[in-house]
């Protein structure tokens, strides 16, 4: 299914409260079945809780959490001869952000606080201080890449 042209990037509007496009992307990733207002309530509620607990700017804590979760290298499968090698490759900036958002949300959903607002704020606080499930996921990804460094010459 090749395309004649590369699909152009869509313009993402900044969110109304903080004026940040990354917060909008995060909201869109949390959203189920097009329920944007529910996603907004969850994200803004979590950021308000973060502000109450840390007494810091919530968007700064959010960005710190994303930076701490975003992977620098990952492994990709590459077939050479009859063998499949896990080849470490650098992660593009857009993919870094997308993976960080995805991992933060899945880690928050896996927590066992009562509401999603509490789960998300807890995971954001953990990730901003280099703890939590999402940060562990990044560490595991980096370990895999380090373990397979011998195959880095198979890069493409």
Curated annotation (Swiss-Prot):
GO terms for cellular component: small ribosomal subunit. The keyword Nuclease does not apply. The keyword Ribosomal protein applies. It holds the Pfam family Ribosomal_S7. Keywords: Ribonucleoprotein, Ribosomal protein, RNA-binding, rRNA-binding, tRNA-binding. It comes from the Bacteria. GO terms for molecular function: rRNA binding; structural constituent of ribosome; tRNA binding. InterPro entries: Ribosomal_uS7 (IPR000235), Ribosomal_uS7_bac/org-type (IPR005717), Ribosomal_uS7_CS (IPR020606), Ribosomal_uS7_dom (IPR023798), Ribosomal_uS7_dom_sf (IPR036823). GO terms for biological process: translation. PANTHER family: RIBOSOMAL PROTEIN S7. Part of the 30S ribosomal subunit. Contacts proteins S9 and S11. One of the primary rRNA binding proteins, it binds directly to 16S rRNA where it nucleates assembly of the head domain of the 30S subunit. Is located at the subunit interface close to the decoding center, probably blocks exit of the E-site tRNA. Belongs to the universal ribosomal protein uS7 family. This is Small ribosomal subunit protein uS7. The lineage of its organism: Bacteria, Pseudomonadati, Pseudomonadota, Alphaproteobacteria, Hyphomicrobiales. The gene is rpsG.
């Amino acid at each position: 299914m090749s395309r004649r042209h590369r699909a152009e990037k869509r313009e993402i509007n900044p969110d109304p409260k903080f004026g940040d496009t990354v917060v909008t992307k995060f909201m869109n990733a949390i959203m189920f079945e097009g329920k944007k207002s529910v996603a907004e309530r969850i994200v803004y509620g979590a950021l308000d809780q973060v502000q109450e607990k840390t007494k810091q700017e919530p968007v700064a804590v959010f960005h710190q959490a994303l930076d701490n979760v975003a992977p620098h290298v990952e492994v990709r499968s590459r077939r050479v001869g009859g063998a499949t090698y896990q080849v470490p490759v650098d992660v593009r900036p857009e993919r870094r952000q997308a993976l960080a958002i995805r991992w933060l949300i899945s880690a928050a959903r896996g927590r066992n606080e009562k509401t999603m607002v509490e789960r998300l704020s807890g995971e954001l606080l953990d990730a901003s201080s280099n703890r939590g499930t999402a940060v562990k996921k990044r560490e595991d990804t980096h370990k895999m890449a380090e373990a397979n460094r011998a195959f880095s010459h198979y890069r493409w």
